[in-house]
From Swiss-Prot:
It comes from Drosophila pseudoobscura pseudoobscura. Interacts with tw/POMT2. CDD domains: beta-trefoil_MIR_POMT1. The keyword Repeat applies. Residues 39-54, 132-149 have a biased composition (Polar residues). This is Protein O-mannosyltransferase 1. One of its GO terms (molecular function) is dolichyl-phosphate-mannose-protein mannosyltransferase activity. It is found in: Endoplasmic reticulum membrane.
Length: 908
């Protein structure tokens, strides 16, 4: 037993030695593994530090079913852990949780994956500890995902470090890892992603084909091409013109046709006149047609930015293609297609801007683009500024929502507010002013519209009034012969003639029977008056000119009849609440003349106290009654030769009481028959045309553009806003002189009526949801409710902002004024169609699922009907096909559509 015990003991000793050797081997292998892990960890950390990463992050790549790790696990720092535990509405990388996930497991959106990473890490550590304490056993390998590029580089660096450590050369490990990190850093990181949206390109091609088909047909002047063509011709010859809308659209077309060789010599005489062979008709209509083609993909993009599904966005673009009114309006030299494109793209960029991170490159680009596009919309037509107002509403609403975000500091909120002011107020103002700067720099010659502007503005232009006033005296003195012009509003000059007021008017009121004083709209010899000091008897300029100053009292003597300007307490003929103004005739009765007028210079802060020709704006106040000489705006009857009435109003502060001297000369007469030479002083004579600053020109032109729109006359095809939604009245654009072929502005009836119904459906659903949610009944998900509100803020409010203001506009309106509102109505229709599909899918389950199929089938049939109506009315959009009278009659679906037949025979 003892020997056996000794043997057993010897065996035990041998076994013990073997175990000790195994432990030593295990210890050495463990130390090697720790060194390898340390080397690999240092390599990866060094690589991350080289790339500028502050915290080590865990990246993953998602697959179709499960997500798998694509990089080795690294220990997280406390800052990383705190970042993980702080929720944020966006990913750590600033992307959206739905579309642009940062694919980072440190992001709070990937918390389930992070849990799986932690559990896998714990399992690996436990398996490593068990392998070190127990006899190693062979275990099957777990399936791992295919390695990414970063994994391959890290595994290669790890293998190199392991080979180094196994050979005992651990120092070289750092050299290899540094070289690998430098190689990875030196590798180019710039990538370009090219993606093509087939829906967008398909819509563009469809719109392009319909807009550019026979673009030069008809080769005649169509509707407002008469006016816009004249303006473009004036741009070619640098001649000043007046238009009630900003000039950007006309500038773009003028720039293009100048490149095409147009010289501006063609005279746009009347609608229907044939273009000359040298007029590039195609290039005249190119930019409107191109903008009309781009409108379809722009609407598609806007609907995508509003979070509609792709099929609904494509439906919106297709409806733009299939609407006849948008087709017609974009094929000729008209401004609406440019206006609609700029407004649509501006709102789309705004919606994307609101989702970008503050200060990022995308944030800056989208915000700047939105500001420029919305400003361009307003610089094409003033209605475009309503889109800018809509943008302001959306920005204010978004800022209001940001106030509830506790994660934003006060500084960040101020940055949000100030940046929006800069992008959506500063940029539009700069663009708008820049457009008019180009306008004034280009149009520096006098033209046919000069008389609308003030004398100072006219004198600043080459030719015209400048050629008359360039050598005339500057200061108004005793003995000056002047013409007094009504400065603001209607252009006319203070005028008198030998005719007198009737003894009694039609309303049985009596008059003074004195000589008439009127305001005449044309140059005439009876517009001349002589300035006279009351205490002097002569009417000549002395050797030392007696300059009239602010506050001086004068008399105005009519140059032809030699009678002085008078007023008294007698009611004016057309404005009884004001005093009559006349030239005094001495009938040898007790009523003496009241001939004294006080000169008040209104802009003396800039022009001085001396009365100057052209630039000084004066008010003439009657000394006896305190009433100011005023243009009343009323027209006299036949006894007054239909000239305009001039009165004296005790309410002195009024724009119509402002006058200025336009033509002026000094004369000295020895007797009343002969005029002597003019007495001119060099220091008082302008040597060149009057200088007017850019800001003075801009302010005056803006004022005139605002007032001029009120004087437009009615048109036989004008319409009222309440007639637009159901298209009660269209517009005849052009009629062929040889047949009944014509161009008539009408929309696609099916689209217009369905879109009007969509407005009512949305308003009804909004009221229904609001009441139900007040009762804590939630018929739609929170996500769908937010989309519903967003569509209302963008499309419903946009429609109302572009439509309701026309009810308060006192001017001639046409159907094409409704097109900006119609586009927003069409956008809202697309959302309503998608929302109804959502409601059916949500609430119709089981046997009711067939209702979804029925709805979609009905939608498809409706779309086919829209295409059929579009094709049916194409002859009225193109005007290229000759139609018989019967064919025209068949297209008259409403009695209010006034189509035109040959020989100007209208359908009644």
């Amino acid at each position: 037993m003892y020997n056996n015990n000794n043997d057993g003991g010897g065996g035990g000793s041998a076994n013990g030695n073997t175990m000790q050797q195994r432990r030593k081997t295990t210890t050495r292998s463990r130390s090697k593994q720790q060194q390898q892990q340390q080397c690999t960890s240092e390599n990866v950390i060094e690589k991350n530090q080289t790339n500028g990463a502050q915290n080590e992050r865990l990246h993953f790549r998602g697959s179709s079913k499960d997500s798998a790790l694509s990089t080795p696990l690294l220990p997280r720092s406390r800052s990383t852990t705190s970042a993980i535990n702080s929720p944020s509405p966006l990913c750590c990388n600033g992307g959206l949780s739905i579309l642009n996930c940062c694919r980072d497991v440190n992001c709070h959106l990937n918390a389930p994956l992070r849990g799986s990473v932690e559990s896998s890490r714990s399992r690996r550590s436990e398996s490593r500890q068990s392998s070190l304490t127990a006899t190693p056993t062979t275990t099957p390998k777990q399936a791992s995902p295919s390695p990414t590029i970063s994994e391959r580089s890290r595994s290669c660096s790890g293998s190199r470090s392991r080979s180094c450590s196994c050979d005992g050369r651990l120092v070289d490990c750092h050299k290899h890892s540094a070289a690998a990190a430098a190689a990875s850093t030196a590798a180019p990181q710039f990538t370009v992603n090219l993606s093509i949206d087939l829906f967008s390109w398909t819509l563009f091609l469809l719109a392009f084909c319909t807009r550019f088909y026979k673009l030069a047909t008809p080769p005649h002047i169509v509707f407002d091409e008469l006016h816009y063509g004249k303006y473009i011709a004036h741009y070619m010859r640098n001649i000043f013109f007046f238009d009630q809308h900003p000039p950007l659209g006309k500038q773009l077309i003028a720039g293009l046709v100048s490149l095409a060789g147009y010289d501006g010599n063609y005279t746009f005489s009347r609608i229907g006149a044939a273009y000359a062979p040298d007029v590039p008709i195609f290039w005249f209509r190119f930019i409107p047609a191109l903008c009309g083609s781009l409108l379809a993909p722009a609407v598609y993009r806007l609907l995508l930015e509003a979070r509609l599904h792709r099929w609904a966005a494509a439906l919106g673009g297709l409806l733009v293609v299939l609407d006849n009114s948008l087709l017609t309006q974009s094929r000729f030299v008209l401004m609406e297609s440019m206006l609609l494109l700029a407004s649509t793209l501006g709102i789309a960029c705004l919606l994307r801007f609101q989702r970008c991170r503050l200060g990022s490159f995308q944030w800056l680009c989208n915000g700047s683009a939105a500001g420029v596009l919305l400003a361009c919309a307003g610089a094409v037509k003033y209605i475009g500024f309503l889109a800018l107002a809509l943008a302001g509403y959306l920005l204010c609403r978004h800022l209001w929502q940001l106030l509830y975000d506790a994660s934003l500091t006060n500084r960040q909120l101020w940055m949000h507010a100030l940046s929006r002011l800069l992008l959506f107020v500063g940029i539009p103002i700069a663009v708008y002013i820049g457009v008019f700067y180009v306008h004034f720099r280009t149009l520096h010659r006098a033209g046919p519209h000069d008389s609308i502007m003030t004398s100072a503005f006219q004198a600043s232009l080459e030719g015209g009034l400048a050629s008359i006033t360039s050598g005339q005296p500057l200061a108004v003195v005793h003995g000056s012969q002047i013409t007094l012009r009504h400065t603001h509003g209607r252009t006319c000059w203070l005028h008198s003639h030998a005719a007198v007021y009737p003894v009694r008017y039609k309303d049985k009121r009596g008059s003074s029977h004195q000589q008439q004083v009127t305001c005449y709209s044309f140059k005439d010899v009876n517009n001349w008056w002589i300035v006279k000091r009351p205490e002097r008897d002569d009417l000549v300029v002395g050797e030392q000119p007696d300059v009239i100053q602010h506050g001086d009292v004068i008399q105005l003597v009519h140059g032809i009849t030699s009678r002085a300007l008078n007023s008294h307490d007698v009611a004016a003929p057309m404005t009884p609440q004001c005093q009559e103004v006349s030239c005094y005739i001495d009938y040898e009765i007790k009523m003496a003349g009241e001939l004294l007028w006080r000169v008040e210079i209104l802009n003396r802060n800039s022009e001085g106290d001396s009365w100057h020709a052209i630039k000084s704006e004066i008010r003439l106040v009657h000394e006896s009654t305190g009433a100011a000489l005023k243009f009343s705006g009323r027209q006299l009857p036949d006894w007054g030769f239909n000239q305009h009435e001039v009165v004296a109003d005790r309410d002195q502060v009024h724009e119509d009481a402002i006058w200025n001297v336009e033509e002026h000369r000094y004369t000295k007469t020895q007797d009343q028959r002969e005029r002597e030479r003019q007495l001119l002083s060099a220091e008082m004579i302008p040597t060149k045309r009057t200088k007017l600053s850019f800001w003075a020109k801009l302010l005056e032109l803006q004022t005139k553009m605002f007032w001029h729109g009120k004087h437009l006359q009615a048109h036989m095809y004008s319409s009222l806003p309440h007639e637009w939604p159901l298209m009660d009245k269209g517009i005849a654009y052009w009629l062929d002189s040889q047949s009944s072929a014509q161009i008539y502005l009408l929309g696609n009836v099916l689209i217009w009526y369905t879109a009007s119904a969509g407005i009512l459906v949305y308003a009804t659903l909004l009221a229904f949801y609001a009441v139900r949610r007040r009762r804590l009944c939630f018929d739609v998900s929170q996500h769908e409710w937010q989309r519903f509100l967003m569509a209302g803020d963008t499309f419903f409010v946009g429609y109302m902002m572009h439509y309701l203001p026309y009810y308060f506009v006192d001017r001639t309106l046409f159907l094409h004024n409704y097109l900006p509102a119609f586009v927003f109505k069409l956008l809202l229709l697309c959302f309503v169609v998608e929302h109804l599909d959502y409601l059916l899918r949500r609430h119709c389950s089981g046997r009711g699922v067939h209702l979804v199929r029925v709805y979609r089938l009905a939608l498809l049939l409706w779309l086919l009907a829209v295409g059929s109506v579009f094709v049916k009315f194409l002859p009225l959009s193109y005007g290229a096909r000759k139609m018989t009278i019967e064919e025209v009659r068949r297209l008259r679906w409403k009695d209010t559509w006034d189509f035109i037949l040959q020989k100007n025979y209208a359908l009644n």
